[in-house]
Regions:
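N-terminal auxiliary segments of SAM/dcSAM-dependent transferases
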Residues: 1-36
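Conserved alpha-helix/loop element of class I SAM-dependent methyltransferases that forms part
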Residues: 33-61, 68-74, 78
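Class I SAM-dependent methyltransferase SAM/SAH-binding core
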Residues: 58-109
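Short conserved loop adjoining the S-adenosyl-L-methionine
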Residues: 107-113, 129
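A short SAM/SAH-binding and catalytic strip from SAM-dependent methyltransferases
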Residues: 116-133
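A short glycine-rich, Lys/Arg-flanked "PGG" loop and its adjoining helix->strand segment in the class I
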Residues: 129-148
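Core SAM-dependent methyltransferase catalytic element
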Residues: 168-192
Length: 192
């Protein structure tokens, strides 16, 4: 859908779609401020994102939250059959592209339980805050059995500690750690 709205059968609300970009935040929705377009990160690269999420082919859906969403178009070209769902307000100005969906969301992700093959994001702070702790639970909820969550540390001296705290929060949700480095952690959903 390029223009219009999506209706929710549960809450009966309507969510606007303009230029192919969905605003799936719960009401009351503030106006989306003008934000710069999300650009692909230098690190991690699109290839690293695909590798750490274990993506070689489709089908499936993968959420890319925040700055990692800048790789959505490149990843859609690298891994056919996967729909990459970029979740960031800075995607509003992007052109439509095959294999890429663009939206913004609130604290609850607009996906069914266990519906995603993977989720990638850059740690914006530590999960010890109430918001990020509930985000770890929300990521766990939406990832399918054997699906992966990859968290990269934001550039700078706080990258390592933030990644370690995210690792602890995701482990507390019952996820298995597949890889743990100073700048990234990858976990796998084993329950469902």
């Amino acid at each position: 859908m390029i223009e219009g709205s999506l209706g929710c059968p549960n809450c009966r609300d309507r969510f606007p779609v303009a230029g192919g970009f969905g605003d799936l935040r719960p009401p009351p929705r503030s106006t989306l401020d003008e934000v710069a377009d999300v650009e692909p990160l230098v690190s991690p690269s699109a290839m690293e994102v695909a590798a750490l999420l274990g993506l070689t082919d489709g089908p499936g859906n993968v959420a890319l939250i925040g700055d990692v969403a800048g790789h959505a178009t490149a990843l859609a070209g690298l891994v056919p059959g996967i729909e990459f769902i970029g979740i960031a307000p800075g995607l509003r100005g992007w052109e439509e592209g095959e294999g890429v969906s663009r939206l913004t969301a609130g604290a609850s992700l607009p996906f069914s339980n266990g519906s995603l093959r993977g989720v990638g994001l850059v740690a914006e702070g530590s999960p010890s805050s109430a918001a990020n702790s509930s985000m770890a639970a929300e990521l766990t909820r939406v990832v399918a059995r054997d699906g992966r969550i990859a968290v990269w540390g934001a550039a700078g001296p706080t990258a390592g500690p933030a990644v370690r705290e995210w690792e602890g929060a995701l482990k507390a949700e019952g996820l298995d750690v597949l890889a743990s480095e100073e700048t990234a952690v990858v976990v796998r959903q084993v329950a469902r």
